[in-house]
Amino acid sequence: NEIQTFLVSQIEYYTKEAESYKEMAKEYNIDDGSVHDTAFGIIVGCIYSSFLQIFTNQNSVPNSQDIEEFTEIIIKNSKKIKESIIT
């Protein structure tokens, strides 16, 4: 599936660049305890933005099945994303 392939490639990119997003999260947090959560949110937000951009480029909007697929892929890869932030 085209969307799944795209999302997996985005997850790969953002996990490789996780250190940059962790640094960005540090800039937004006074409390060091929430840096990892903030970085996770930034990364998932970037992936979601890219996901929506696919539809915008096609003059379309995601339907509930597309959103469900996005959510499932993020959940399935959340451990990988979190580990990339921690290491």
Give residue ranges: language-model regions.
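Short terminal alpha-helical segments
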Residues: 1-26
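Short, flexible segments with low predicted structural confidence
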Residues: 26-27, 42
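Short acidic, glycine/proline-enriched loop segments that cap or flank alpha-helices
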Residues: 30-39, 57-65
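Acidic, low-complexity, intrinsically disordered interaction modules
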Residues: 36-56
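Charged low-complexity stretches with an acidic bias
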Residues: 53-87
